[in-house]
């Protein structure tokens, strides 16, 4: 949150996890009742005052196959961290490589606690719910009324201890690093200034060493030239 002291909430994290799961499962969801199908396709469409009463058809075998794919949890954790970024949650440590990456914390939390069977069950709860499909760029849909499919996933997740542990862990991680960012803002500036001065000092030392080296070489060459001249004078 870039220096903000506000607390990220459990509810926000739950919504982000639900949204991420829903997005990961889009390929397993199709529409029922083609007569009432509402879809927005193409670019630049503006749709106002939409009332939707549609049902979802859920391909359970697709869901089962999808959640068991090797990269599913990785993709899900990437989706969640990206959604956190989109919500302006600070996912940086002020360029300080010495602090543990909270993105790694979030990924490990998901891998340990958010089991694929739980995800499959919560997605299966969507069967019969409503959905609005919008595809393309620059589309605007306003005043749309529909049942919240993602809320069904949220309610399912809140009924599982594993999911609660995941959500709590992610929320604590975000708040921990946001607190670090806020608490250490001026420390970071001081460290940056100190680093600049250190770099200047290092550069100054290098320049001095180069100058000393040139002087030493000049003195050495000058001494050899003087010795040769003295030898020539002695011979003459």
Curated annotation (Swiss-Prot):
<feature type="topological domain" description="Cytoplasmic">
    <location>
        <begin position="2"/>
        <end position="199"/>
    </location>
</feature>
<keyword id="KW-1043">Host membrane</keyword>
<keyword id="KW-0519">Myristate</keyword>
<feature type="transmembrane region" description="Helical">
    <location>
        <begin position="200"/>
        <end position="220"/>
    </location>
</feature>
<keyword id="KW-0472">Membrane</keyword>
<protein>
    <recommendedName>
        <fullName>Inner membrane protein pE248R</fullName>
    </recommendedName>
</protein>
<keyword id="KW-1231">Capsid inner membrane protein</keyword>
<dbReference type="InterPro" id="IPR003472">
    <property type="entry name" value="Virion_mem_poxvirus_L1"/>
</dbReference>
<dbReference type="GO" id="GO:0033644">
    <property type="term" value="C:host cell membrane"/>
</dbReference>
<feature type="topological domain" description="Extracellular">
    <location>
        <begin position="221"/>
        <end position="236"/>
    </location>
</feature>
<keyword id="KW-0946">Virion</keyword>
<dbReference type="GO" id="GO:0039641">
    <property type="term" value="C:viral inner membrane"/>
</dbReference>
<keyword id="KW-0735">Signal-anchor</keyword>
<comment type="similarity">
    <text>Belongs to the asfivirus E248R family.</text>
</comment>
<dbReference type="GO" id="GO:0016020">
    <property type="term" value="C:membrane"/>
</dbReference>
<keyword id="KW-1133">Transmembrane helix</keyword>
<keyword id="KW-0449">Lipoprotein</keyword>
<keyword id="KW-0812">Transmembrane</keyword>
<feature type="lipid moiety-binding region" description="N-myristoyl glycine; by host">
    <location>
        <position position="2"/>
    </location>
</feature>
<comment type="subunit">
    <text>Interacts with A151R.</text>
</comment>
<dbReference type="Pfam" id="PF02442">
    <property type="entry name" value="L1R_F9L"/>
</dbReference>
<comment type="function">
    <text>Essential for viral fusion with host endosomal membrane and core release.</text>
</comment>
<dbReference type="GO" id="GO:0055036">
    <property type="term" value="C:virion membrane"/>
</dbReference>
